[in-house]
Each structure stands twice: as C-alpha cells, then as structure tokens.
C-alpha cells in the first residue's frame, strides 16, 4: 500500500527518515540530543530550515556568537554526509561531516571536524576545523 502523500512524513534535512521523528524532536524543543552526532544533525537541519535560535541554543556559551547572520538569498542545502563520530573524552566528542550546498548556480562542499562538549548533561557545539571550501 502506498502512503497518502498528504499524510506522508516530511523527510529530515539531515538525510534520515521523517523530520518529526528525527531532528524535529530537537529543533525548537527542549528535548536535548542524546549524543554529539544527533546534535550535529539537528544543527544541520536548523541551517537548512533557517532556525537560528536552535543554532544559538546549542552553541556552548564559551564560544557562542551574539547573533548568526541570515543565510544568503537563494542558498540551498543539498545534503549531509556524516563521516565520523567519536568520543574524545567522557564529555567530549568530534563529528566529521560534509555538507553540500548550492548558491547562485554554484555547488559548494563544507568539510568540517566539529568539537562538542557535554555540559550539565546536555551536548553543545564548541567549535570546528573547516577544510578550505571546495566549489564545483
């Protein structure tokens, strides 16, 4: 049986199944992500959906900017590939990922190794190392 398109769940921007059962459980809610990879996926979804409040709320206070600029007009996020997720300590983790986007007809890849910390039981984005951008 084919699901009714009107009631089919929206796909999650992070590439996993339904948004409401994936990143939608964390973006704009008080439910903390259970691990750094889940938090990183929810942050990617927040970038796709322009939910800057989630990005700020999940950024560690020690490195959080005062504000996040809106995305450039016409930016389209095309996909996320998580390459590695590893614990680096009892309350620290790294997630390596590639996020693809398109702007003004040009494709771009963002390759980052992000660092996360668990503070008072919640995971937060700390910072990341970004490889030089690749266009094309």
UniProtKB/Swiss-Prot annotation:
Q: What SUPFAM superfamilies does the record point to?
A: NTF2-like
Could you tell me which InterPro entries the record lists for this protein?
A: NTF2-like_dom_sf, UPF0225, YchJ-like_M
Family note: Belongs to the UPF0225 family.
First and last residue of the signal peptide: none
Q: What is this protein called?
A: UPF0225 protein Mpe_A2093
């Amino acid at each position: 049986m084919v699901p009714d398109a009107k009631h089919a769940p929206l796909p999650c921007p992070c590439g996993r199944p339904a948004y409401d059962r994936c990143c939608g459980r964390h973006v704009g809610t008080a439910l903390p992500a259970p691990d750094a990879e889940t938090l990183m996926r929810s942050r990617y979804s927040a970038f796709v959906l322009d939910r800057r409040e989630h990005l700020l709320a999940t950024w560690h206070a020690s490195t959080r900017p005062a504000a996040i600029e809106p995305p450039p007009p016409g930016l389209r996020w095309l996909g996320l590939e998580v390459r590695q997720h590893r614990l680096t300590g009892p309350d620290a983790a790294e997630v390596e990922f590639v996020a693809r986007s398109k702007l003004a007809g040009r494709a771009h890849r963002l390759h980052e190794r992000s660092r996360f910390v668990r503070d008072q039981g919640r995971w937060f984005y700390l910072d990341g190392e970004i490889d030089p951008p690749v266009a094309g």
